[in-house]
Amino acid sequence: MKARLLVLLCALAATDADTICIGYHANNSTDTVDTVLEKNVTVTHSVNLLEDSHNGKLCRLKGIAPLQLGKCNIAGWLLGNPECDPLLPARSWSYIVETPNSENGICYPGAFIDYEELREQLSSVSSFERFEIFPKESSWPNHNTNIGVTAACSHAGKSSFYRNLLWLTKKGGSYPKLKNSYVNKKGKEVLVLWGIHHPSNSKDQQTLYQNENAYVSVVSSNYNRRFTPEIAERPEVRDQAGRMNYYWTLLEPGDTIMFEANGNLVAPWYAFALSRGFGSGIITSNASMHECNTKCQTPQGAINSSLPFQNIHPVTIGECPKYVRSAKLRMVTGLRNIPSIQSRGLFGAIAGFIEGGWTGMIDGWYGYHHQNEQGSGYAADQKSTQNAINGITNKVNSVIEKMNTQFTAVGKEFNNLEKRMENLNKKVDDGFLDIWTYNAELLVLLENERTLDFHDSNVKNLYEKVKSQLKNNAKEIGNGCFEFYHKCDNECMESVRNGTYDYPKYSEESKLNREKIDGVKLESMGVYQILAIYSTVASSLVLLVSLGAISFWMCSNGSLQCRICI
């Protein structure tokens, strides 16, 4: 009876003890992050670094509308294909949009020489001035400028020709040698385009130009070329057996371009004074134009995001996140989210930072939970929480700032004869893309690992801070909790939290209670030893009596014979 009483008193003493625990915040977040060592770690707070959504629209870029070429491509627009007349007034744009199946390019069959290079040059142009470089009425008085039309470039059912070129033919039965020049006084680069006609037979050559041995010479400071017509039979394209090759050059400010020919020249009529602008570009897209504004445009749609990475499209125009192949880039800012199991009781797993966090502590990341005669409650440690928030916020901002180099990324241009170069370029681009993706993912993994370790360290430091104050005035009971050997009211609890706990004040009371508890433990241990001995002896006696009874019964019925020899 005495032993039972002592054990009961011991249990009551443990139940009534004042307790303080160190723990961390938990919530109902389902955010998961990856670290170097773990995948899908549930955390209380995190930030997404990867943009994966767009609006599916073509938008104005910083308030400036794009130039939609519609059914025309770059060649048709610049040469002046009659079907592209609606594009003639275009003067400025934020970016240029081609459709994948644009059908109106060069209308008279032939080849546009160095077309891909021209597209590359144009991708950095944001506006131009279209002007008459060689006025039609005065530049070629000895040549016909009116009959050079073709059904291949028909418009409204009638034969026509490019709006920016003049097809010069003989006049009055002759094609005298022509010489004409232009001096660039625009103060900017001027794009000049011209063509060379290659008839299919000598009859057409004589009909159009009279001279059989014709030539065309085009010369500037940076360009010097002499062309000879190639007269040969060819299969018809767009009902034309002849061909026309198209050429271009950029004329620097102050430079002069000179044309000399005695036949087959498709002369410049209009030229373009170019104004380059950073952030322009050419994209190929089927998306439609809408009344919207953006800072970043992709062929799939506009991106309005300040995140450093995106996985939508590698081609971008404007201030855009860096394209990576990652499916997820999430950086942790909070803690591991392991809400404690409520049914285990307040000071079981719920109390500690080992088995779980506290959903009840909402005003900080780290803090305390106490229980005494005045009640119980949570209190966040504001100083350590604020220091952690500041540190992590600065780190996240630094990562975003370093990686958030927003820029335009347009595709490179290659013609059909440069497939090996194009394939090599794709491999190089893929290599750089893999490196960028790897660097981005590794950066996030490392920073997530460091952040979670940082939180663990902060909780441990808070625990050690309390432990160093309480010393032997309390005992560690696991899960981040301490059980006081003395009464600790709310004022006492607050002193532990703010680091002003008066150890000497409670030392004597703690010493007495500690000795009482130790005494109960010793006496309880003696009682248990006596009970153990008694239990052993009693069990042995019961066993002997049972064996004797069984032996007597077996002897009496003859099952067992007993002989005693003297």
From Swiss-Prot:
**UniProt key word Membrane:** yes
Residues on the Extracellular side?
18-529
Which intervals lie on the Cytoplasmic side per UniProt? Answer: 551-566
One GO biological-process annotation of the entry reads: virion attachment to host cell
| Membrane topology field | Single-pass type I membrane protein
Report which superkingdom the organism of origin falls in.
Viruses
- One GO molecular-function entry: host cell surface receptor binding
GO terms for cellular component: host cell plasma membrane; membrane; viral envelope; virion membrane
Give residues with lipid attachment (S-palmitoyl cysteine).
Answer: 555, 562, 565
Q: Main localization of the protein?
A: virion
Annotated glycosylation sites: 27-28, 40, 286, 304, 498
Q: How is it modified after translation?
A: Palmitoylated.
Q: Which UniProt keywords apply?
A: Clathrin- and caveolin-independent endocytosis of virus by host, Clathrin-mediated endocytosis of virus by host, Disulfide bond, Fusion of virus membrane with host endosomal membrane, Fusion of virus membrane with host membrane, Glycoprotein, Hemagglutinin, Host cell membrane, Host membrane, Host-virus interaction, Lipoprotein, Membrane, Palmitate, Signal, Transmembrane, Transmembrane helix, Viral attachment to host cell, Viral envelope protein, Viral penetration into host cytoplasm, Virion, Virus endocytosis by host, Virus entry into host cell
**In this UniProt entry, which cysteines form S-S bonds?**
21-481, 59-292, 72-84, 107-153, 296-320, 488-492
Q: What else is known?
A: Major glycoprotein, comprises over 80% of the envelope proteins present in virus particle. The extent of infection into host organism is determined by HA. Influenza viruses bud from the apical surface of polarized epithelial cells (e.g. bronchial epithelial cells) into lumen of lungs and are therefore usually pneumotropic. The reason is that HA is cleaved by tryptase clara which is restricted to lungs. However, HAs of H5 and H7 pantropic avian viruses subtypes can be cleaved by furin and subtilisin-type enzymes, allowing the virus to grow in other organs than lungs.
Q: What does this protein do?
A: Binds to sialic acid-containing receptors on the cell surface, bringing about the attachment of the virus particle to the cell. This attachment induces virion internalization either through clathrin-dependent endocytosis or through clathrin- and caveolin-independent pathway. Plays a major role in the determination of host range restriction and virulence. Class I viral fusion protein. Responsible for penetration of the virus into the cell cytoplasm by mediating the fusion of the membrane of the endocytosed virus particle with the endosomal membrane.
- Could you say which protein family the record assigns here? Belongs to the influenza viruses hemagglutinin family.
For this entry, the protein name equals: Hemagglutinin
> Per UniProt, what is the name of the gene that codes for the protein in this document?
HA
